[in-house]
């Protein structure tokens, strides 16, 4: 887990990419806890929670854009699976929303909470395959 804290370079895009990865990991964990809490107490996703999920998606997209900038500058991840984890990070929340009842039922809280938990795993794998 020390790779979560290590910064070994002076490239601004790379520093941003690593920082956004950590932010995405933490934020997705918070979204998982919040969604599962809503499910446990029997409530559908609140407007605030749905808005927070949009921010999580925005962070995933921003991470992807910075990753593309890095690629154009000649940087490459340690493992090519890193690209797959990036795509999965971007499509997971829209997929969960597509499977849901548009955020109106208690079950949707479960879907979004589990999607957040899944994204924690995706973020950890993305960090692991990007570092080298």
What are these model-derived regions, one by one?
Residues 2-29:
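Hydrophobic transmembrane alpha-helical segments in integral membrane proteins
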Residues 19-27, 76-89:
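Structural signature of hydrophobic alpha-helical transmembrane segments
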Residues 24-42:
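N-terminal signal-anchor/start-transfer transmembrane helix
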Residues 40-50, 100-108:
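Membrane-interface helix-boundary motifs at transmembrane edges
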Residues 44-60, 81:
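Loop-to-helix transition at the N-terminal end of transmembrane alpha-helices
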Residues 56-70:
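A generic, lipid-embedded transmembrane alpha helix
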Residues 64-67, 90-101:
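Transmembrane alpha-helical segments of integral membrane proteins
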Residues 121-132:
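Juxtamembrane boundary at the C-terminal end of a transmembrane helix
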């Amino acid at each position: 887990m020390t790779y979560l804290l290590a910064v070994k370079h002076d490239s601004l895009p790379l520093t941003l990419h690593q920082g956004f990865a950590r932010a995405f990991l933490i934020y997705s964990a918070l979204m998982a806890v919040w969604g599962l809490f809503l499910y446990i107490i029997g409530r559908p996703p609140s407007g605030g929670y749905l808005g927070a999920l949009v921010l999580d998606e925005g962070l995933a997209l921003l991470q992807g854009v910075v990753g593309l900038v890095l690629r154009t500058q000649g940087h490459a991840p340690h493992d090519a699976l890193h690209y797959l984890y990036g795509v999965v990070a971007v499509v997971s929340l829209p997929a969960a929303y597509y499977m849901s009842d548009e955020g109106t039922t208690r079950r949707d809280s479960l879907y979004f909470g589990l999607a957040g938990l899944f994204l924690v795993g995706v973020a950890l794998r993305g960090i692991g395959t990007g570092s080298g």
